[in-house]
């Protein structure tokens, strides 16, 4: 809606709410850095010029840039609610994000997506959503819900929904699965974007995927892959998350000719990284240090994303655009000093200012339908060698190994001396009683157990341990607190991190979650865990779409065969 007061302020007929003077304005439209003033009225930029104002702030030559935008993120990976997430990323200059609520949708379906939209209202960051396209991800596990075309149609009418989220089922696209194509057609008929997800896809299959309308990809890991997709018309989101870090590898592809087709995203970023390292701002800073033109780097983090998703009033500093503005002392470190969101200062000297809004209530739907007393992690002894999941450090892929396992009194047992531990996935959504059982190598636990209700993509409870009693204690702790992470030994929980929102997120500030995680990680290390973040490693072992051997509540999955295999050969 046109605000006539903004027009009046732009003409100088009335005083503006705010003028930021003596700025070096990063103009992402012209590619220049211009000395000047910015007048703000009613939350929008009124003029790139000096005006009478109720409040005047002298920036004394500091840089003024557009707010940064994350092109693709799963807020659930931050382990906090959308409101608490926004409190953290605004400190780093992120004023808008495009979030895919895929994780909570796998647990709560339509209600989960609705919660995420509602929980973002009033946050200092503009949180927009792409409706999940692949819920559940596969038939090889029990999800809490499913989203069909009829379920996503109402969301496509919502003003906060800007597209269809990453279409992970690229085989379904290229082999013309009717339901997959129906979802894409629904998005296109509503003039929404269709985000892609096509790791390694090339040649004729890539062309077929693009012919269906997939428009972007955040899964590129090599320059060759990204350049082929750019040349074929795709937009590329360069990703720098907690697990997947592609910035250094992909920055060399950025040129003056192709930079308008490139954006920045985080995908999955955990509390420690968000609090201690930063967000999209660190991608901008590193890009500039590695030789990307500063205005180009900032444009990739703002205007490119806004234009792709149709956010016409965001991404730049110009009359009529939303006054999402960053004050930055220099463009090398790109340390964000002050942040204005809709013309209101929300960050001053790097610190968040108090917000009058109370966080929204968390959803009341239970997602812990587990008969803890009936849990049985017994594995009967087998006659052949066992198939064992082998962890690969710092990777979400695993290897498949075979070997002898410890057997006694007709049972197959954990063998911590050889780093072979029991692993189980307990179905938590529908009370089926399903328990998938197997063995894993590489965790290093010498005693105790670790359990988590964060287990991609269906987020059942996954547990690894040395003995059954501790595995049961860890699962009980997770179930009793409505979801979360737990470390147990001696038949009791030693430390926990509650995640009561769908078993994925906390309703507490990120700083508190980070403290709980620090204690939990220390406990895991004391039990012998070798990985830097054993819970992150654990969370991907139930994902049956990433090779090579994984486990779900239905059993052991050979991902290359895309089918179940027996535990013993």
Curated annotation (Swiss-Prot):
Claim: Magnesium is one of the keywords in the record: no
Enzyme Commission number(s): 3.5.4.2
Substrates-to-products reaction catalysed: adenine + H2O + H(+) = hypoxanthine + NH4(+)
Alphabetical list of Pfam families matching this protein: Adenine_deam_C, Amidohydro_1
InterPro entries: Adenine_deam, Adenine_deam_C, Amidohydro-rel, Metal-dep_hydrolase_composite, Metal_Hydrolase
Molecular function in Gene Ontology: adenine deaminase activity
Gene3D superfamilies attached to this UniProt entry: Metal-dependent hydrolases, Urease, subunit C, domain 1
Keywords assigned by UniProt, alphabetized: Hydrolase, Manganese
SUPFAM superfamilies: Composite domain of metallo-dependent hydrolases, Metallo-dependent hydrolases
Obligatory cofactor(s): Mn(2+)
GO biological processes: adenine catabolic process
Highest taxon of source: Bacteria
CDD domains hit by this protein: AdeC
NCBIfam families attached to this UniProt entry: ade
Family affiliation: Belongs to the metallo-dependent hydrolases superfamily. Adenine deaminase family.
Protein name: Adenine deaminase
Lineage: Bacteria, Pseudomonadati, Thermodesulfobacteriota, Desulfobacteria, Desulfobacterales
Gene that specifies this protein: ade
């Amino acid at each position: 809606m046109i605000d006539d007061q903004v027009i009046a302020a732009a003409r100088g007929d009335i005083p503006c709410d705010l003028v930021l003077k003596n700025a070096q304005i990063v103009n992402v439209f012209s590619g220049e850095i211009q000395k000047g003033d910015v007048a703000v009225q009613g939350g929008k930029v009124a003029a790139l010029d000096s005006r009478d104002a109720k409040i005047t702030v002298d920036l004394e030559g500091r840089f003024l840039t557009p707010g940064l935008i994350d092109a693709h993120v799963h807020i659930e990976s931050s382990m906090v609610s959308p409101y608490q997430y926004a409190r953290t990323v605004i400190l780093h200059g992120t004023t808008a994000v495009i979030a895919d609520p895929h994780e909570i949708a796998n647990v709560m379906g339509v209600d989960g997506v609705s919660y995420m939209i509602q929980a973002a209202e009033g946050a200092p960051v503009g949180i927009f959503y792409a409706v999940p396209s692949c819920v559940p991800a596969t038939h090889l596990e029990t999800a809490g819900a499913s989203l069909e075309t009829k379920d996503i149609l109402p969301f496509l009418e919502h003003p906060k929904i800007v597209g269809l989220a990453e279409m992970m089922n690229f085989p379904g696209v290229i082999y013309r699965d009717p339901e997959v194509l129906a979802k894409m057609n629904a998005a296109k008929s509503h003039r929404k974007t269709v985000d892609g997800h096509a790791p390694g896809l090339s040649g004729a299959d890539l062309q077929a995927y693009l012919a269906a309308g997939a428009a972007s990809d955040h899964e590129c890991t090599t320059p060759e892959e990204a350049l082929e997709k750019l040349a074929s018309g795709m937009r590329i989101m360069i990703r720098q998350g907690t697990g997947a870090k592609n910035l250094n590898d992909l920055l060399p592809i950025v040129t003056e000719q192709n930079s308008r087709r490139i954006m920045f995203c985080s995908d999955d970023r955990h509390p420690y990284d968000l609090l201690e390292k930063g967000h999209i701002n660190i991608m901008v800073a590193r890009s500039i240090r590695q030789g990307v033109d500063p205005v180009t780097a900032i444009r990739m983090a703002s205007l490119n994303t806004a234009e792709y998703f149709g956010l016409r009033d965001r991404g730049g500093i110009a009359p009529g655009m939303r006054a999402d503005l960053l004050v930055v002392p220099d463009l090398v470190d790109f340390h964000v000093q002050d942040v204005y969101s809709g013309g209101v200062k929300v960050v001053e000297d790097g610190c968040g200012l108090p917000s009058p809004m109370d966080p929204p209530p968390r959803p009341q739907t239970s997602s812990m339908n587990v008969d803890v007393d009936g849990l049985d992690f017994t594995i009967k002894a087998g006659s052949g060698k066992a198939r064992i999941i082998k962890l690969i450090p710092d990777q979400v892929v695993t290897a498949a190994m075979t070997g002898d396992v410890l057997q006694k009194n007709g049972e197959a047992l954990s063998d911590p001396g050889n780093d072979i531990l029991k692993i189980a996935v307990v179905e938590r959504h529908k009370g089926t009683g399903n328990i998938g059982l197997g063995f894993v190598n590489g965790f290093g636990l010498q005693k105790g157990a670790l359990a988590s209700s964060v287990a991609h993509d269906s987020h059942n409870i996954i547990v690894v341990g040395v003995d059954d009693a501790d595995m049961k204690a860890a699962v009980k702790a997770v179930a009793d607190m409505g979801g979360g992470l737990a470390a147990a030994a001696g038949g009791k929980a030693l430390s926990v991190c509650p995640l009561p929102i769908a078993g994925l997120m906390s309703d507490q500030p990120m700083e508190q979650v980070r403290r709980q995680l620090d204690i939990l990680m220390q406990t895991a290390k004391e039990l012998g865990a070798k990985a830097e973040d054993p819970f992150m490693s654990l969370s991907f072992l139930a994902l049956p779409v990433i090779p090579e051997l994984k486990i779900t509540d239905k059993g052991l999955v050979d991902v290359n065969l895309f089918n179940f295999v027996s535990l013993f050969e």
